């Protein structure tokens, strides 16, 4: 039982170290892509829907929203949540490396529980 716990704990440490370096690379790539997208957006004309001094901006994660298209990021969706009996819609990141790492940790914890039995 102790051996099983030690093996899984060492796996978690390896995944945490690997994911942090992968996340740093991913953030750097996203930041670079954002710069390129911003420059290319400046070259195009504004949409017909945007009038006057109004400009479109995206809603950050965990802020209220109405539609998926309002949220920032490719894997971010406008998802409904229930808070104190009221339904609210929040922008949430539903994909990416973090979700995969958390899923791996959840599977590892379930393996530890099965080792104890």
Curated annotation (Swiss-Prot):
Keyword Transmembrane helix tagged: no
Main location: secreted
Residues spanning the signal sequence: 1-20
GO MF term list: ion channel regulator activity; toxin activity
Propeptide: 21-56
Region (Disordered): 20-55
Composition-biased stretches (Basic and acidic residues): 23-55
Alphabetical keyword list: Disulfide bond, Ion channel impairing toxin, Knottin, Secreted, Signal, Toxin
Cellular component per GO, a single term: extracellular region
Disulfide bonds: 58-72, 65-78, 69-115, 71-91
Compartment(s): Secreted
Tissues with expression: Expressed by the venom gland.
Family under the similarity heading: Belongs to the neurotoxin 03 (Tx2) family. 02 subfamily. HNTX-XV sub-subfamily.
Entry note about domains: The presence of a 'disulfide through disulfide knot' structurally defines this protein as a knottin.
Role according to the record: Putative ion channel inhibitor.
Protein name, entry field: Hainantoxin-XV-2
Provenance organism: Cyriopagopus hainanus (Chinese bird spider)
Native organism taxonomy: Eukaryota, Metazoa, Ecdysozoa, Arthropoda, Chelicerata
């Amino acid at each position: 039982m102790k051996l099983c716990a030690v093996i899984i704990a060492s796996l978690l440490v390896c995944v945490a170290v690997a994911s942090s370096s992968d996340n740093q690379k991913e953030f750097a790539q996203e930041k670079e892509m954002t710069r390129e997208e911003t420059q290319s957006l400046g070259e195009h004309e504004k949409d017909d829907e945007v009038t006057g001094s109004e400009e479109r901006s995206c809603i950050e994660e965990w802020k209220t929203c109405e539609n998926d298209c309002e949220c920032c990021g490719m894997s971010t969706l406008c998802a409904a949540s229930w808070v104190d009996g009221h339904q609210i819609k929040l922008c949430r990141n539903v994909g990416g490396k973090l979700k995969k790492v958390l899923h791996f940790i959840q599977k590892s914890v379930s393996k530890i529980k099965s080792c104890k039995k």
